[in-house]
């Protein structure tokens, strides 16, 4: 497995930023992730609709899928912004779309880009992971492995050690499940699943630990798309956030075509 860090400890850019499409129009960065669903990723759906616009995928789980257990949101955002700066001209507007729990990461990236160019953060159904969310997610993953009776993870202290501790619990539960099912020879499959679980929990912990102050001074314009009546963003006044209400859809697909069209309209109509 490739190590996500360089010799000086920086996040490897080839694991945090990937260009999906090329183009001459205003660039779009999409912070999203492929956690436990086989559904198409938002970044790929955007790339097929944002005609003529270069689309980049910012993937926090890739940045956390190697030997390094934990990376802060600020460090991930800095590396993504730096790599993007090497790929695109340093002027002209840029859009950063953040999906769900990746909202804070998108705001970090947009704030960094806004230092040298107009930048807009478009947050689709933003969520702000906290201790309760991580505890619930950890319990769900443990239950998926048919284990029970696990205590809630300790999330304070050194974050790398917190992630490693959760990983050790999940690894033991996976080994027990494999043995009970006669699957001792499926180490590779379980190792991949463990890495997915670990990177997801590490990302949520990075979101929970982030002070959410980097964007408080403004710089990037912020739009929130959600079905909810409230479009609040931590550390920003309501007047600094543009709220676009999403329609209530019967479609259980969270990234239904109607939703994607509304997101794309935000990056093509300005």
Q: What are these regions, as identified by a protein language model?
A:
Residues 45-49, 109-116:
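Alpha-helical structural signal in soluble globular domains
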Residues 62-92, 258-270:
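Helix-loop module immediately N-terminal to the HCX5R catalytic loop
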Residues 48-65:
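Conserved alpha/beta-hydrolase
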Residues 29-34, 99:
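The conserved beta1-alpha1 loop
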């Amino acid at each position: 497995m490739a190590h996500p860090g360089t010799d000086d400890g920086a996040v490897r850019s080839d694991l945090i930023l990937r260009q999906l499409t090329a183009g001459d129009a205003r660039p779009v960065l999409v912070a999203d992730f492929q956690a436990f669903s086989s559904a198409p990723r938002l970044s790929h759906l955007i790339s097929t609709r944002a005609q003529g616009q270069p689309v980049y995928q910012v993937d926090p789980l890739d940045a956390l899928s190697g030997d390094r257990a934990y990376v802060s949101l600020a460090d991930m955002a800095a590396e993504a912004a730096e790599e993007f700066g090497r790929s695109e001209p340093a002027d002209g507007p840029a859009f950063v779309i953040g999906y769900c729990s990746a909202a804070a990461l998108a705001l970090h990236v947009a704030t960094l880009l806004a230092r040298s160019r107009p930048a807009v953060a478009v947050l689709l159904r933003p969520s702000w992971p906290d201790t309760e969310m991580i505890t619930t997610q950890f319990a769900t993953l443990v239950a998926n492995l048919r284990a029970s009776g696990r205590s809630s993870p300790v999330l304070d202290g050194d974050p790398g050690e917190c992630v490693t501790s959760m990983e050790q619990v999940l690894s033991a539960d996976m080994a027990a499940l494999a043995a009970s099912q006669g699957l001792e020879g499926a180490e590779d499959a379980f190792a991949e699943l463990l890495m997915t679980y670990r990177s997801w929990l590490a990302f949520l912990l990075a979101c929970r630990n982030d002070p959410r102050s980097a964007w408080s001074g403004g710089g990037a314009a912020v739009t929130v798309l959600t079905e909810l009546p409230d479009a609040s963003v931590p550390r920003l006044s309501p007047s600094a956030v543009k709220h676009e209400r999403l329609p209530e859809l019967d479609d259980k697909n969270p990234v239904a075509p109607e939703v994607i069209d509304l997101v794309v309209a935000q990056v093509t109509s300005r």
